[in-house]
Amino acid sequence: MDDTFLLSNIVPQDLDNNGDFWNRTEMYCRDLTKKFSDVRVISGPLWLPLDDDDKITMDNANGIIQQPKMLSNGRPCKPHKTVSYPVIGKNEVAVPTHLYKVVMAEDQSLEKPILSAFIVPNQPISKDKTLIDFQVPLSYLESKVGLRFHSRLDRDSVNDLCSIDGCSLMRYRDFQAFFIHRGIKNARNKNELERYWRQAKRYDLSSEDEIKKVYESRYAELQENTSNAESH
C-alpha cells in the first residue's frame, strides 16, 4: 500500500473527480475485498484522442466557434483524431485525459473469476453517472494502453464483474454522509467539529439520526475535555 503514495506511482488528476467519482470507485474496490478472497485492481492513465467533430462540439458548448480546417480548393478537410492535454509544473508533467481500472475478483464461491474494465474521463463526473456507464471491453482497453492484462488468464473462463456484483457505487449523499460522520467523530476541537456540522447542514444531513448522535456525543466529549483542562 505504501507504494501507492510514491510520486513515481501517481498521476495528475482532476480534483473534483479524485474527491468524488474516483474516490467512490476506489471505495467500491475496497468493499470487494470483504466479499471475495482475492481482489486485484490495476489502475493507470490514458491519453485518448478526440475527433475533430468532437472538438468542434466541445468548443461550441463553451461558446467558442471553431470552423473545420479547409483544403486549398475550399472543401473541408476530413475529420482526423488528435490528442490534446494540459501539462503542469516546471517539468511540464502531462495530465492524462482519462484514467482506467481493471478489477478482477476470485473466490471459492465463484464458478469463474469475475472481471470488468473501466475508462473514466479525467474531469468532473455528473452525480447521476454510474460505474457501468464507463465500462469497456477489456480488449478495447488493452488496445488503447498497449498492454495485455492478466496474460495467463483464459478469457473464456471469466465472467463479468458487473453482471455478478452490480458495480454499484455508494450514492453521492451517502458518500458525503460517510465523510462528514467520520470528520465529526474524529474532530480534534470545537472549531473543527463545528466546521463538519456546517457541512452536514449544507448537505441537509444534520437531521440524520447517526450524524446528529455522533455530533452530540463528540460535542459532549470536547466540552468535558475543556472543563477538565480549565480545572487543573
Positions of predicted regions on the chain:
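Domain-level detector of nuclease and nuclease-like folds
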Residues: M1-Y196, R202, T226-H232
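Repeat-associated, polar segments at repeat-unit boundaries in modular proteins
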Residues: A200-H232
